[in-house]
């Protein structure tokens, strides 16, 4: 049965689909902005709610307990020593440079350490900004060499991936890629350039990004300061009560979803009805509009606050009505007054309108750059750990062995192999380097009980007591 979710209308190239006829007992759902009209016995588009006799019911019982999770024994959560400065025993058939034992809570704990060259490696760079940096898949350069690409965007953050096995082995840029990965992972300042296309002319253009772990990025010469509160729709959902007290209408500009306060369901929740103002964006659902990507406000094509107002329907609006235009960081704020002819005129910001902008600002985090090192240690480096390489892989996934990188806990991807990601801000300073194979070199530690180490075929004859290390004595 049709629930008027409008998917078919939106994808039909001929505009040939009409709305469904209303049936007795049909109930409108309010669990998202689609607002399906669900006939008796049917479910909404999301399949979560069923109309049972004129009442919408969640058709799955509340689940109290999640799946059992593998928990790491606290005794093996931290390595006995880090691999930083340990060196590498190559070829990997040799035992790791250091296999160290320490007694913890009466249990012998082993850590094997090596500085492992990893061909499968790179860094995921997270930039907390709304500023446009190019389209997903655009090539990223460093010193004129291709080193990565613009990655899938995350909520409030632009993402860049530098490296990967294919970039490292490429004829053009392999060495530059290795250097760039290491510089970023070690917290150094790096200038990247994204090659993209101008939205108006289609001609190639370059976007320069200066990034450094723990520092807000600089994009085309402008230092970023603020991470958005959320998308434009989320901003209204969070601050609708403040907006109602302060303005007649509010447009929150955002490249993902631009919000229109009076039409939004959060606006309706606080007593608003549509004001007649039409945003300059493509409508998605009530109060939610898709903004085009560009180098304007909030990463959109809109260059000025006035550009955000497409038109005003004067059969609904009235002269003197106030319209606040802002963005999701509160860095932009302009107040407009509707004129009798349907045009709008900018007027000085009122104290009330400023309250809305300040409320957005006060709920934003500062912009930052985060660098996460990604690597795969499921290759020959396992030989330095034990005689049975599959055994250490299985031990890691079973939680019997704990992988850390330069002392920092790593998230190991599910499935086969030992592929991981680690926050370099938590890793020992300047822990990474590279070799001209080319590959990056990462400090890899595996920690487990001595009993489990023996079970996986560990190099038992090479175990040393941590107290025998002069560095440990100084520590």
Where are each of the predicted segments found?
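Auxiliary Fe-S-binding modules of radical SAM enzymes
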Residues: 30-40, 182-475
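Short, ordered beta-strand-loop transition motifs
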Residues: 23-25, 40-42, 101-107
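Iron-sulfur cluster-binding cysteine motifs and their immediate structural context
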Residues: 1, 7-22, 31-50
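Short cysteine/histidine-rich metal-coordination sites, predominantly Zn2+-binding motifs
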Residues: 21-26, 45-55, 61-67
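Long, contiguous alpha-helical scaffold regions
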Residues: 81-244, 248
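Generic recognition of long tandem-repeat/solenoid scaffolds
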Residues: 27, 46, 109-113
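Short active-site-adjacent helix-start/loop capping segments
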Residues: 38, 54-56, 120-121
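Short Fe-S-cluster ligation motifs
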Residues: 33-36, 57-83
């Amino acid at each position: 049965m049709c629930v008027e979710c409008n998917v078919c209308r939106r994808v039909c190239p001929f505009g040939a689909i009409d709305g469904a006829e209303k049936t007795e007992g049909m109930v409108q759902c309010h669990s998202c902005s689609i607002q399906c009209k669900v006939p008796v016995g049917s479910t909404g588009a999301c399949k979560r709610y069923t109309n049972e006799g004129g009442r919408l019911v969640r058709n799955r019982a509340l689940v109290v307990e999640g799946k059992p999770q593998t928990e790491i024994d606290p005794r093996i959560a931290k390595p006995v020593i880090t691999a930083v400065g340990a060196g590498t025993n190559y070829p990997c058939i040799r035992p790791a440079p250091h296999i160290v034992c320490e007694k913890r809570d009466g249990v012998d704990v082993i850590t094997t350490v090596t500085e492992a060259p990893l061909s499968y490696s790179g860094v995921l760079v997270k930039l907390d900004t709304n500023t446009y940096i190019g389209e997903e898949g655009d090539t990223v350069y460093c010193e004129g060499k291709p080193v990565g690409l613009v990655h899938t965007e995350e909520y409030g953050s632009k993402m860049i991936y530098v490296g990967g096995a294919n970039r490292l082995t490429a004829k053009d840029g392999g060495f530059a890629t290795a250097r760039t990965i290491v510089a970023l992972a070690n917290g150094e300042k790096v200038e990247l350039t994204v090659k993209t296309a101008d939205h108006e002319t289609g001609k190639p253009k370059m976007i320069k990004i200066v990034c450094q772990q723990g520092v807000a990025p600089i994009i085309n010469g402008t230092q970023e300061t603020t991470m958005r509160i959320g998308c434009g729709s989320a901003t209204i959902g969070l601050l609708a009560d403040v907006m109602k007290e302060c303005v007649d209408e509010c447009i929150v500009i955002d490249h993902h979803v631009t919000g229109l306060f009076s039409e939004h369901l959060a606006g309706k929740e606080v007593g608003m009805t549509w004001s007649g103002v039409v945003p300059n964006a493509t409508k998605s659902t009530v109060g939610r509009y898709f903004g085009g990507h560009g180098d304007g406000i909030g990463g959109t094509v809109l260059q000025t606050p006035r550009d955000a107002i497409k038109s005003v329907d004067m059969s609904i609006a009235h002269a003197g009505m106030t319209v606040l235009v802002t963005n999701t960081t509160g860095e932009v704020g302009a107040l407009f007054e509707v004129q009798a002819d349907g045009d709008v005129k900018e007027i000085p910001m009122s104290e009330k309108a400023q309250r809305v902008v300040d409320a957005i600002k006060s709920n934003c985090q500062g912009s930052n750059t985060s660098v996460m090192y990604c690597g795969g240690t499921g290759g020959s480096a396992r030989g330095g750990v034990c005689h049975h390489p599959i055994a250490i892989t299985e031990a890691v996934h079973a939680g019997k062995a704990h992988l850390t990188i330069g002392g920092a806990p790593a998230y190991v991807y599910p499935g086969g192999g030992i592929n991981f990601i680690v926050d370099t801000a938590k890793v020992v300073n300047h822990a990474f380097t590279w070799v001209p194979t080319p590959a990056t070199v990462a400090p890899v530690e595996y920690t487990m009980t001595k009993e489990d180490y023996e079970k996986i075929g560990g190099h038992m004859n090479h175990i040393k007591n941590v107290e025998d290390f002069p560095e440990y004595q100084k520590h």
